[in-house]
Amino acid sequence: LLLTGIDRLRAAVRVQAERHKHTPMIGRTHGIHAEPITFGLKCASWYAELGRDRRRLVAARDEIAFGKLSGAVGTFANNEPAIEATILGRLGLHPEPIATQVVPRDRHAVYFTTLAVLGGSCERIALEIRHLQRTEVGEAAEPFGKGQKGSSAMPHKRNPILTENVCGIARLVRGYAMAALENIALWHERDISHSSVERVIAPDATLALDFALARLAGVVEELDVRPAAMATNLSRLGGAIFSEQVLLALVRKGVARDQ
C-alpha cells in the first residue's frame, strides 16, 4: 500500500516538475525573497526526496521481515532450526539469527522511524503548498471543489484544509515512531510492555500514512499553479534579487564583502 502510494505521489510530482520546469518564481530563504528559481525545480526536489523515501521503505520492509520459532527464550530447547526456517520461509520471513522470546524490537523501530521520515517528506510538500496559498503569496493553491465551503463564518475564504490535514497526520506518525523507539528496551529475554503499543501503532501508523499519501497525491495532481502571481512576486524587489552578482563583481575588484 505505502509503496503504491509513494509511486502515485512521485508520478504526480514529476508531472508538475516537467510542466513547470520553465516557470520562474522567487526562491525564499528564511521566508524572505532570495534569488529566482523555477517551480519545476521545487517539484524536482520533492521528487528526489520521495525517491529516497521509497528506497528507505523497501530497506525497512526487508529489515522487519524476520520471525522466530526458536522457543521460549530463543534456545531451540524443544524445536529444530530447520523447522523454524521451513515455516518462516512459507510466510516469506527470515529466521531471526539471535532471538530471545521475541524478535528484537530495533527492527520494528527502523520501520516506524522510516514511516516518520516519509511522513515528514509529505509534510514538507504540504507545508510548502500551504505557504504558497497564503493570500499575500497566492502562487499556488490546493484544489477547491464546486460547492465546497471555505469557512463556516467567512465564506470568502479558501482554506488549505487538505494539506493541513497531511501536516497533522505527519505529526501523529512521528509520535508513533517515538513509541517504537521506546519499545526497543525490554526486560531480559522479554516482557510485554511493547505489545499494547504495537497493537495501536502498527495499524494506525500504516493506515494514516497511506491516507496522507493518497490525499497529498490528489492535491498535487490537481494543484492550481499560478505563473502570473509568481511573476508578480518575482518582480516585487526589482533588481535587488540579483544582488549576489553585484557583490561578487565588487569582490573581484577588491572590495571587501562587509563593505
Residue ranges and their predicted role:
Residues 1-34, 94-107, 188-193:
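Long, non-coiled-coil amphipathic alpha-helical linker/lever segments
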Residues 7, 35-186:
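Internal glycine-rich alpha/beta core junctions
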Residues 2, 6-9, 13, 20, ...:
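Hydrophobic alpha-helical packing residues
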Residues 18, 89, 251:
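Short polybasic/polar patches that bind polyanions
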Residues 154-259:
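Glycine-rich cofactor/substrate-binding loops
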Residues 16-41, 68-84, 139-154, 192-198, ...:
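Charge-rich, acidic-biased intrinsically disordered regions
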